[in-house]
Every structure is written in C-alpha cells, then in structure tokens.
A protein has these predicted regions:
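A glycine/threonine-rich phosphate-anchoring loop and its flanking beta-alpha core
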Residues: 97-139, 151-152, 262-358, 449-452, ...
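Short glycine/serine/threonine-rich phosphate/pyrophosphate-binding segments
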Residues: 18-19, 43-45, 82-89, 102-104, ...
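ATP/NTP phosphate-donor binding region
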Residues: 1-79, 141-240
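A short, small-residue-rich loop immediately preceding and capping a beta-strand
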Residues: 70-100, 233-274, 280-288, 415
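Mobile late-domain/C-terminal helix-loop "cap" segments
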Residues: 436-541
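C-terminal and late-domain segments of enzyme folds
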Residues: 336-399, 403
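Glycine-rich phosphate/pyrophosphate-binding beta-alpha loops
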Residues: 291, 399-431, 518-522
Length: 541
C-alpha cells in the first residue's frame, strides 16, 4: 500500500483576506508582482487589489488574461478563474476566487489560495469546498459531523509532499533525482544506525550520490550541535538535508535551516514566529516514530541546555520539501516508545481542537488524527508487527502535526516543555501525564469542543447517548483509562504520574517559572498563573 499526497499550499480565509496578500509576498522577498484578470473583471480586480498593503518599493501590475506577464515578474496573482500564464521562471502563484463558480476546482500550480468571505456568503459553501479540497490529505472523505466553525480570519499551510504507506523508503531516490540533489547531508542518531535503518536507506539510494552522514543527534535537539552541523554543511558544500529519526533529529534539521538563513550567527535571533524567509535548501524528512509529526509542521523545538529550556521557532518555511512515512520503519519501535509517542500525537490533536488558535482545517486534521489513534494506538502497542496499525499511527501523527502546526497548542505543551527543559523527561511521557489534568483545568472554557471529541474517541453512539454536560468529563475519563491501559500493556513503563518520569517536588518552582515563558501559553483557552501551574504539578504528581 502506497499513497502520494501532494502539498496543498497555503490557504488564507476570512473577511477582507485580500489585505494579507502584501505580507505573503513581502515575506518571500517578492517586489515585482503581476496580477492576471479576465478583461471583464479588470476594474473589479483593480479595486480589490487596492486593499493590499504592499511594502514600499513593491510594483504591482494588472494585466488581462490575453496579455503576457512582464519578463521581470517575481510573483503572480490570478484573479477569479484566470488561467496560469507562462513565465520565464517559476513564480509563486496566488489565486483569488471572485465568485462561487471559481471554487469548482483549485487549479494546479497555486501556492497560496485567498478565500475572501465577502464573495462567498452562501451558507455551507466554503465548508463544502474546504472538505473537498483536503479530502486527499485526510486519506478519505471527512467524517467530521459538525458544521465547520470559521474565525474572523485564519491561515493554514501545508507545503510538504507526503509519501505514505508500506515500503516507501525507496521513493527518496526519486525525490533527490527530481530535485537535482547530488550531495546531501544525512542527519540521524546512533539508535537508527544500531537498528539497521540507516543501512536500509543508504542501500536504496544511487551509489553515485555524495552523501555524508552525521549520526550524533542527542535525544533533545541542541543549539550547539546545530551550529556544528551547519558548519559541516557549508564546509563540505552540501546541496540538501535528509533527516531520518524521531522528533529531535527532524527538529535538528529545521534548526540547520534557521542557522543557514542567518549565515551561521546566533540562531536565537530568529526565535519566535514568522521571522524566516524561504530557504533554497531542500529538506527531506523520514520519521521513525509516530508522535511528533515534525515532518509536517511549521514548528521546531530546540533545547537550550545552558538555560535549561526549550526554544520555539515557528515559520511556514520550516516545512520540509517532502516527507516519507514508511510503516516498516516503526515496526521495531518498542511498546513503551510506541505508547508515549502516540500520546504525544494525541496531545497535538486534542490541543489543536481546543486551543484559541483553532480553525476549520486544523479541526478536520485533528479529528481524523483522533479517529486513527483510537483505531490503532493500543493495537500498535499490543501487535507491533502489524503494518496496518503502524501505517495508521504514522498518518495520525502527521495529521495531528499539521493540525497543531496551524492552530498551535496550549498548556499541556506549556508545562511539558518546561518539564523537559528542567528535568530532561521524555516529551511524550510529559504529554501523556499532563493531558487529562490540563483538560480538567480548561474544562469550563472548552465545554463544547471537548465534548465533541467523544465522537472520534468513543463513537457517535456514545456522544448521542451522553448528556451534553457529561461529554467533556467522559473524554477526560477515557484518556485516563487509555493511559492506564497503556501502562499495563507496556509492563508498567507508560507513565500515569509525574513521579514516574523522575520529576521531583523540588523541581516544581523551576518548572513553573520556565512554563510562564513558553510561547504556547498564549493559546491556552484559560489564563494560567504561576500558582495554577504549581497546583497542576501537585495534582499530576
């Protein structure tokens, strides 16, 4: 079984979404923009584009669809159903549908789709269009039974080509050949080497490739290591990065992209959100766990061991060129690692669905991820060699990654990042322990959204036969029962409390202080104080 899922690019949807266009071109360094419109819509197009707020020095030209774009065009805007013109070079393409008929299909070659809700007021129109647009990404038609809820404006980015299934590792060679990559650096860890997974990858590639391997990535990606890997990348004149491993390896590759963007200066200069420009370095990611979803996200979490904290970087340009999900790579993953990485994916999906940054597309992705986790997590722990469960877990992790990458997360990650930084506890273990306690704390602020999650976790019948006020508590109870079940299935290694992951009460103060500086805190649906964090740590202990 093998599927190729093409990137859907960026969708910007909301009232007056056109006003965001200037930023999208600016962040890509594009100054010469050509807008193409049907001749009958030229006046409307001019009026609409006047709402843009381009950077000084940006030149926007509007032409009819029967004209050729100027040779110096760096970016294209296609108005309505205007066809994609030929240009001297490949340009980013932004499309603005103007009438409902323009939504009949999304033409190939569109990088950014702008859905201005002023043009699509008919109830359910955008709901239906978005479900169909992302049908392939979800691996099937959306089973989400509720109307999509649209905030004032939102953006969803999915720029990574995905190859998913069984025995898909051999597809990497085709990707490298297509992108003319001949001298990549392969980043991994020694566990991957010891398991024989690296040999399998290298054996599948063209022996004529000039590959250098760096297998010294630690369990937490590290600022200093990223610096030395970047120096090697330049010194050996590499032309691409392959990352094979768990979340630490994948985030290390993203850290290299940030460092290359800065020319080797302090990576912390770009800590935060949306400070990166597009990178010319092609990156290919091959996850060997099913939890972080880092191969699909706009996020990199990198350890700063000097400060004992995790640093967060967010940019759509951190998404890799392509990702390969091969079920055979996770079959050797021990039950304990399967369980905690699976709960990491669950925390991503649940927080994406309940945090302040949620949007209709992150809801669809999170929902499908939870359906897959319900079907496959316990089974993958109990029957690790069955490809159907490994395959389901790989896609669940990827979908949950795409969801939270575009909605962000909340206090589970706020506190979990702090515990990881202060105590060195595994991230997935932190997520497993904290998730039910965080949902209890946020409960009154997320009553409706939390209650809906009873459907993917326990089925529509359970949802319909449970009183509205009891649905949220039923979800929390189910997650606790799942943790206990995984605890038993892993011979007691899957944690249900903080004391099981070497957290001590004497660490609580440092954890709470670090948590208050975590960027995910702002997306939590309920305010969280130092005292609140201390109480939650006590409860989870």
């Amino acid at each position: 079984m093998k599927r190729r899922i093409l990137p859907t690019g960026t969708v910007i949807c909301g009232t007056a979404a056109v006003e965001q266009i200037g930023y999208e071109f600016s962040v890509r360094g594009i100054r010469r923009i050509t807008a193409v419109s049907d001749s009958k819509l030229l006046n409307k197009s001019r009026s609409l584009l006047s709402d843009m707020e381009p950077d000084p020095g940006t030149d926007i030209r509007i032409i009819s669809s029967d004209e050729e774009p100027p040779e110096d065009t760096e970016g294209l805007i296609l108005m309505g159903s205007a066809p994609l013109p030929e240009t001297k070079r490949r340009c980013p393409v932004l499309r603005i549908p103007l009438v409902p008929d323009d939504l009949s299909s999304r033409l190939p070659g569109t990088d950014i789709l702008v859905l201005d809700r002023r043009f699509f007021r008919r109830e359910g129109l955008l709901d239906q269009f978005l479900r169909e647009l992302y049908r392939e990404s979800l691996s099937e038609e959306s089973s989400y039974p509720f109307p999509l809820q649209f905030p004032g404006i939102f953006q969803f980015s999915a720029d990574t080509e995905l190859i998913w299934g069984d025995e898909t590792l051999g597809e990497l060679g085709e990707l490298l050949s297509r992108d003319k990559v001949r001298a990549p650096m392969l980043v991994t860890d020694r566990g991957i080497v010891a398991a024989g997974l690296l040999k399998g990858l290298l054996d599948s590639l063209d022996p004529g490739l000039d590959i250098i391997v760096r297998d010294n990535v630690p369990p937490d990606s590290d600022l200093q290591l990223i610096g030395s890997l970047t120096e090697d990348y330049r010194a050996y004149r590499r032309d691409g990065i392959i990352a094979m491993g768990g979340g630490s390896v994948l985030d290390t590759a993203k850290g290299m992209i940030i460092n290359l963007e800065l020319g080797g200066k302090n990576i912390l200069a770009l800590e935060g959100s949306n400070l990166l420009s597009p990178s010319p370095v092609p990156v290919y990611m091959i996850p060997t766990t099913s939890g972080t979803g880092s191969e699909a996200t706009r996020v990199a979490v990198i350890a700063d061991h000097n400060e004992k904290r995790k640093r967060l970087f967010v940019s759509q340009f951190l998404q890799p060129r392509a990702a390969i999900l091969d079920s055979s790579l996770t079959i050797s993953l021990p039950p304990y690692l399967t369980s905690i990485t699976g709960m990491d994916a669950m925390s991503h999906a649940v927080e994406a669905f309940t945090c302040l940054g949620k949007n209709p597309l992150s809801d669809l992705m999170a929902w499908r991820a939870l359906e897959l986790l319900s079907a496959h997590l316990e089974q993958a722990v109990t029957f690790p060699a069955q490809a159907v469960h490994r395959r389901g877990m790989a896609l669940a992790s990827n979908l949950a990654g795409r969801a939270f990458s575009n909605s962000m997360v909340g206090m589970v990650h706020t506190i979990g990042h702090a515990i990881g930084g202060v105590c060195g506890a595994p991230h997935g273990s932190c997520m497993a322990v904290l998730l039910p306690f965080a949902l209890e704390y946020n409960g009154d602020s997320i009553t409706e959204a939390l209650g809906k999650l009873l459907v993917p976790l326990k089925g529509i019948d359970s949802y319909e036969h449970t009183a509205a006020s009891a649905r949220g508590p039923a979800v929390i109870r189910h997650i606790r029962e799942l943790n206990r079940s995984l605890h038993t299935a892993t011979g007691g290694r899957h944690p249900c409390s903080l004391k099981e992951i070497a957290v001590k009460p004497s660490d609580f103060k440092a954890i709470a202080e670090a948590a208050l500086g975590d960027a995910s805190l702002m997306y939590n649906p309920r305010e969280l104080s130092y005292g609140d964090i201390i109480e939650i740590l006590k409860e989870a202990y």
